[in-house]
Amino acid sequence: MRKILVTGGAGFIGSAVVRHIIRNTQDSVVNLDKLTYAGNLESLTDIADNPRYAFEQVDICDRAELDRVFAQHRPDAVMHLAAESHVDRSIGSAGEFIQTNIVGTFNLLEAARAYRQQMPSEKHEAFRFHHISTDEVYGDLSGTDDLFTETAPYAPSSPYSASKASSDHLVRAWLRTYGLPTIVTNCSNNYGPYHFPEKLIPLMILNALDGKPLPVYGDGMQIRDWLFVEDHARALYQVVTEGVVGETYNIGGHNEKANIEVVKTICALLEELAPEKPAGVARYEDLITFVQDRPGHDARYAVDTAKIRRDLGWQPLETFESGLRKTVQWYLDNKTRRQNA
């Protein structure tokens, strides 16, 4: 049985990872999270009292606290998800992204390296540092049907993706220079329960239920590949336990959809699942409002997942249709939680 330190474990993807490990394995989890606006411990209520779960409210930029957590809990692996992740916020406030995503990752790498140096030899060799990143580091696939592979060159477009690209490079450098056994994964857009409502899918669901406009950037034809968060959590655990040191694995759902198609699909699901609409709303689709496009908006992201499917045998269990239906139903069934999401 392993003990895994999960940074950002109160966030959307991190909490799915924590829930997956506690519910489906015998491993223990130390959840390290600063609890920013997007962190939500309610997403972990069901497992919070499990004896294999512990929580530490710590900022990854605080090196002294990181050293304390490593010394106290003595993890066998790190799954690093703590990050500022919203592109729009990065455009207006890039400094927070530089600090958390780059400086914070540096601090965590150094704390992990110092900790590993004093581990017993058998645990020293088995230790893993799994860095969870994004397909946005690869840039844009406009005008092509190609997919990003793990060897695609980096071409980040936003302060967010540039900060994640920087952290990816740090992680690989700590393997090359110091021998820290690192693995990197790059994922496509995630969706599912407990998502903070600044992101596209939860924002559309919650705005529609409140009778508010559904803002769609530009013409809505930007294409994203969508991955159900629980499928991603399974993949991440499989990578940290079975992945090869020094390798990168792309994780995606192979569900390429234009943003406007996603919004219209949500509207259609709500017509079926929530037919009693807010006052003054005849059809949910009538709420769609096209707004000025985001600066530097990438036209298309999509990743090739052949490597993780071939090498680790992972594949998603949810289609976009089944996953989106589960997501919409969750928000309908969890009114109080969705208000606090």
From Swiss-Prot:
InterPro entries: dTDP_Gluc_deHydtase, NAD(P)-bd_dom, NAD(P)-bd_dom_sf. GO terms for biological process: dTDP-rhamnose biosynthetic process; lipopolysaccharide biosynthetic process; O antigen biosynthetic process; polysaccharide biosynthetic process. Substrate binds at residues 85, 134, 189, 199-200, 215-217, 224, 259, 293-297. Keywords: Lipopolysaccharide biosynthesis, Lyase, NAD. SUPFAM superfamilies: NAD(P)-binding Rossmann-fold domains. Its EC number is 4.2.1.46. Catalyzes the dehydration of dTDP-D-glucose to form dTDP-6-deoxy-D-xylo-4-hexulose via a three-step process involving oxidation, dehydration and reduction. Homodimer. This is dTDP-glucose 4,6-dehydratase. It comes from Neisseria meningitidis serogroup A / serotype 4A (strain DSM 15465 / Z2491). The lineage of its organism: Bacteria, Pseudomonadati, Pseudomonadota, Betaproteobacteria, Neisseriales. The gene is rfbB1.
